[in-house]
A protein has these predicted regions:
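Coil residues (strongly favoring Ser/Thr
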Residues: 26-27, 31, 44
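Thiol-based oxidoreductase modules, predominantly thioredoxin-like and allied folds used
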Residues: 48-50, 86, 93-121
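Conserved redox-active cysteine motifs that mediate thiol-disulfide chemistry
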Residues: 72-88
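Hydrophobic beta-strand anchors of alpha/beta hydrolase catalytic cores
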Residues: 68-69, 103, 138
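Short pre-active-site segment immediately N-terminal to redox-active cysteine/selenocysteine motifs
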Residues: 64, 72-76, 134
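A short beta-strand-turn-helix
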Residues: 49-67, 97
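Bacterial Sec-dependent N-terminal signal peptides
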Residues: 1-24
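Non-catalytic, surface beta->alpha helical segment in thiol-disulfide oxidoreductase systems
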Residues: 125-171
Length: 171
């Protein structure tokens, strides 16, 4: 009985400490030793993010392109901020996405005043529909909303581009 109580207490302590840790963007970058020059960062890049899910489905059908749903926590998720900067703000990604993807950002911020109530509702609906539980998540769907591929969590930024290319190639 003592062993069970001790193991339960240890488990609770570990889970609590993991949830309490705040990940800083600097520590993520330092620990991964990312060479950001490889993807040629450009702060002024403007991607063509579509406003709504329904609009993204229409464009996907019309242009025969997969939809990339980017699930992020823009105001709290440090790995999301790194991915946003080091993947989505590159000339290489812009070129690929302009030709081959329909982009939809699904932001789940902690500060609800960052988005309209309608957009928050839509984003929460999409999070539940596709059962997204970790951030960042890149989820690809077809024009009917059927999931094609998904990559959850943060990995070194350079790994995302070949993954996205393979999804586009196989679509």
């Amino acid at each position: 009985m003592k062993k069970i109580i001790i193991k339960a207490a240890w488990f609770f302590a570990v889970v609590t400490s993991l949830n309490a840790q705040e990940v800083r963007k600097d520590s993520v970058l330092d620990s991964l030793h990312i060479n950001s020059k490889k993807l040629e960062l450009v702060d002024s890049i403007k991607l063509n993010w579509i406003a709504t899910y329904d609009e993204a489905l229409e464009i996907s059908k019309k242009e025969n392109k997969p939809i990339l749903l980017y699930f992020t926590g823009s105001d709290w998720c440090a790995p999301c901020k790194v991915l946003d900067k080091e993947l989505f703000h590159t000339e290489k990604f812009k070129e690929l996405s302009d030709k081959n993807l329909v982009l939809l950002e699904v932001d789940i911020p902690r500060k609800h005043d960052l988005l309209s109530p309608d957009k928050i509702s839509e984003n929460l609906y999409l999070k539940e529909k596709y059962r997204v539980n970790s951030f960042p998540t890149l989820l690809f769907v077809n024009h009917k909303g059927k999931k094609i591929s998904e990559k959850s969590g943060y990995v070194i930024t350079e790994y995302y581009f070949p993954y996205i290319q393979s999804v586009v190639y196989n679509y």
